[in-house]
Amino acid sequence: MVRISKQAGNGMTRRGLLQGAAVGGVGIAGASLLPAPTASAVGASNGFVFPGVDVVIDGSHATTDVTLLVREYLARKSEADPDGTMTFFSRNPVTYIDAVLGWSWYDWDSLRTALGQFMPNWPKEGKSYPTRILGNSTGAMVFFTDTAGLFGSSEIRAVGVINFSDRRITRQIDYWDGRHFGISDTAKLRVPTDKFPADFRESTVGETAAQTMKNVSYKLARALRNGDGAGAADLFAPGAVFEDVPAHVQIVGPRSIGSYLTGTASLLPYSGQGTAVRHIVGSATGGGYEWTAADGSASRGVIALELDSWGKITRLTAMWDGSQADDSMLVSLSQKAIER
């Protein structure tokens, strides 16, 4: 069993401090003055630390049970323990796909074999740690970082779409930006196009997301598919934040978000007539959807959503493989964010 204490770390952001002060009565700032509680007694919204990494996990839009489960899972992975890591996976069904490289495993034994090959070569100080979790014990969006040396010379900052059944992972699909990892390094590791998995096996786990998350996801996807920036803007809360990670763009407020989505309707890979929802996970307050695109620079990705009590989007984070886009497209996406 991994013993993990709760404390305030230097990795805490201003946003996280404000959330900690607003939720749960005792803010993050005061947490370090209190005796360290047991993991089972700590609310996810109050923040959790991760062993060996100075970061506070944002679990404000996740249930406590899934935050604890993900933390235990990645802590065991960080110990480079193949057998311990595999205890978090279902025997059947199980799917693990890297959506950028095309690496895929469709049964427990092959995944165990792969971990047994990877993990002995990991640096002793290597970590795989979560930074933000959205969802519940049926499914969640997990923002996590694999430090340099685990799968290459650079770190990987990914969004894992994870389905659970009886506290075991039945499906995990990882999305990340190949530009952050390095375009040439990503290309070296990617499987040939004709070997890339076409079936991401969402049918093996079904659609278990909360109805609110499904409704918002489908409405947003429809607005984006139709290039309807104004319709998409109606789904956002007054102080909402839109962020596209590969494009390095952040937009605040429904009016500005709507204008940006209208102006980039022909540029964003998750916008336009060829796009569709692949799979949805999460609770009524946190989760999101995987998308596919028939045309454009990137053919797959994920949109993570944080919702308020009224079902409005307070934060949208888009993740896709920027190494599939040329420089001019990313420059155009940045230019469209300039308001006049």
Could you say what each language-model-derived stretch is?
Residues L68, E79-G139, G229-A284:
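A solvent-exposed, acidic/Ser-Thr-rich amphipathic alpha-helical stretch
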Residues L18, G27, S32, N46-F50:
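N-terminal leader/capping segments at the start of a protein or of a new domain
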Residues R14-A21:
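N-terminal export leaders
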Residues S45-I57, G116-Q211, A265-Q273, R278-R340:
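A beta-strand edge to alpha-helix "cap/lid" segment located at domain peripheries
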